[in-house]
Amino acid sequence: PWSRDQRALRARATYLHQTLGGDDWPDLSDTALKQNSDWLAPHLLGETRLSAITAEHLGAALDTILPWSRRQEIDLLLPSHFTAPSGSHVPIDYAAENGPALEIRVQELFGLDRHPSVAGGRIPLLLILLSPAHRPIQTTRDLPGFWRGSWKDVAKDLKGRYPRHVWPEDPAAAAAVTRAVVRSAVVGGAVGLAASAA
């Protein structure tokens, strides 16, 4: 019965083990943990049934394998969340099949002119860009290239489906949007910002 946070921590540690650290980081995959129960046994003293194992038991075992100092290292290398230009903190999926992935509404990335990455810039995130209705519209590992390339066609389609939203010609220079807004209000705000910057 792993908690969601425990599963996320295991995924990050396992990704480090498989991709960056080798033996410097423990393999916390299901396969590795099932092969050796020594990591859990000391935390089950007095328990006689498997059904008695709780997230607290598993958490205590994780604390032994990954003490606080090591978790801080993980947080630096592989943060659990990405802070978008919109201000949202979006969880990164390190257990995704094609490497660390981020599902995010495309509007929350307006204003970003570089591709998000982890591990000190060594690993680009797979961006799964979503519509305002949280439906996938595109995947990319090159956000600047997407803005310069296929964004024009994607934006044209989005304008037809979501006319109340603003779909800028140059999203890398636009302001990020966190929620649905009336088109005229955003356009007016953009004009005001442009005037004040001039």
Feature map (PLM): residue ranges:
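Aromatic-enriched hydrophobic runs in primary sequence
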Residues: 39, 91-92, 117, 147
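Acidic, serine/threonine- and proline-rich low-complexity intrinsically disordered segments
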Residues: 1-77, 81, 122-198
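Amphipathic alpha-helical packing elements
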Residues: 74-106
